[in-house]
Amino acid sequence: MQVLQYAPLDLVTHLRDKPSTVDKPIMRPWMSDVFDVAYVPDPAIRRDRLVSPAWQANADGLTGIAPALVVTCEFDRLRAEGIRYAEALRTAGALVEHQDVPATDHGYNILGFGTRALTERTYRLIADHVRTAMTG
């Protein structure tokens, strides 16, 4: 079972090229330089479909991949790539659920930008899907 909560799924495209719909998004372009290098130091490897499954055609042909829950945030710069990956998973028959958390940005659950109830609801959703995957 894949659980992807506001995951970086395209490390090829720099964060400055990923739009946000809010004036002051949590994810700033400089963060791409820090996190992308920390995750995968070699830029050439970032093109690998296992590293950037939402980049270009990397999400094509996902048949047989593990089932997935994808959680995106409405204002997150990573939202579009999460949606692209969720759509590819749906095409492959592997999307269990895509939850787009409304009126939230990246890190809402740990930075205090979402309500406690919203965070708890998302965590319950994740726990329920993992429990179902483990117990059938």
Locate each region found by the language model.
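Alpha/beta-hydrolase superfamily serine-hydrolase fold, recognizing
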Residues: 1-136
